[in-house]
Structures are given as C-alpha cells and as structure tokens.
Amino acid sequence: MEPDPTPLPRRRLKLFR
C-alpha cells in the first residue's frame, strides 16, 4: 500500500497491512 500523507502510528500501519 502507498504511504499515507499523514503519519499513522505503527499499530494503524499493522492494521492497514
């Protein structure tokens, strides 16, 4: 997935992946 413009926490990144 492409990196979002807003810095998301690692927990959010894990959920996104």
From Swiss-Prot:
Q: Which GO terms describe its biological process?
A: response to magnesium ion; transcriptional attenuation by ribosome
Q: Which UniProt keywords apply?
A: Leader peptide
User: What is known about what this protein does?
Assistant: Makes mgtA transcription sensitive to intracellular proline levels. Under low levels of proline this protein cannot be fully translated, and a stem loop forms which permits transcription of the downstream mgtA gene.
The highest taxon in the source lineage is Bacteria
| Protein name as it appears in the record | mgtA leader peptide
Give one Pfam family: MGTL
Q: Which family does it belong to?
A: Belongs to the MgtL family.
